[in-house]
Regions:
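Immediate post-signal peptide segment of exported/extracytoplasmic ligand-binding proteins
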Residues: 27-41, 98-99, 117, 193, ...
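Short, well-ordered beta-strand elements
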Residues: 36-46, 100-104, 124-127, 154-156, ...
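Short, solvent-exposed loop/turn elements at domain surfaces
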Residues: 35-36, 48-55, 80-83, 112, ...
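N-terminal lobe/hinge region of extracytoplasmic solute-binding protein
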Residues: 43-96, 192
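Aromatic- and charge-enriched surface segment that lines or borders ligand/interaction sites
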Residues: 91-135, 155
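Gly/Pro-rich hinge or "lid" segments in bacterial periplasmic/extracellular proteins
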Residues: 76-80, 169-222
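Short, low-complexity disordered leader/linker segments with a strong preference
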Residues: 1-40, 53
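Surface-exposed binding/hinge segments that line
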Residues: 94, 102, 136-180, 198-203
Length: 222
């Protein structure tokens, strides 16, 4: 039985265009004639079982998480130029030597916590260090430590040169999490991300509902 992911105010731009007219409440278009929909329902072949990023490695969970969270590096499936991996929350990076990588971060990113808490190098260090204590440790093979250089720059040390390390940073379970949310004792802090949608409700075995982030830092999505 297929499980449902419900995205209020739509979900992904491509999917929204492809399934326009399917499901949800009607709303009049700007010209007052043709209604459009505010809800997109997506079926998945497997049940969602865990939304704690670093304690799961399930593709069904990642369908949700890649809408609510974002990674340092963006995996390009070929639709956005020739580069296989491009900037995500990191604008650029370079190997200083075989074992040290400097990453510069976007300065306009906020967590979807309702407080517009900025995403900084402290959050990146926190996320990567935490990963080494969880089941996704293998996804960060070779990681030694991170050093915050300034608010929006971080240095990552790896054990030996590995040209695939940057690729590992595009893994959904390594999406950047809010250090402040954990420090403040927020309930289920792993649900707070930087993506265009935020967690609303999950009924296990039935559906998971996300809502659009009204003050999303990136390009406005449908």
């Amino acid at each position: 039985m297929k499980k449902l992911l419900v995205l209020i105010m739509a979900a992904l731009m491509i999917l929204a265009m492809a399934v326009a007219g399917c499901g949800g409440d009607d709303k009049k278009a700007d010209n007052g004639s043709t209604p459009h929909k505010e809800k997109l329902v997506i079926g998945t072949d497997a049940d969602i079982n865990n939304l704690n990023l670093q304690k799961q490695q399930d593709a069904a969970n990642n369908v949700i998480l890649k809408n609510t969270h974002q990674t340092l590096v963006f995996f390009n499936n070929g639709s956005q130029g020739k580069e296989r991996f491009g900037p995500g929350l990191a604008t650029d990076w370079k190997f200083v030597d075989d074992t040290h990588i400097i990453m510069n971060l976007r300065k306009d990113v906020y967590f979807n916590d309702g407080k517009k808490t900025p995403m900084t190098a402290d959050d990146v260090k926190f996320t990567l260090d935490m990963a080494m204590k969880n089941v996704i440790k293998s996804a960060l093979a070779g990681y030694v430590k991170s050093t915050v250089k300034d608010k929006y720059q971080i240095e990552i040390e790896i054990s030996s040169y590995n040209n695939e390390f940057i690729q590992s940073l595009s893994s959904v379970p390594l999406s950047i999490q809010s250090k402040k949310a954990y420090d403040d004792g927020v309930k289920e802090p792993w649900l707070i991300g930087t993506g265009p949608y935020k967690y609303d409700k999950w009924v296990q075995g039935e559906y998971c509902r996300l809502t659009k982030v009204k003050d999303y830092w990136g390009n406005n999505l449908p």
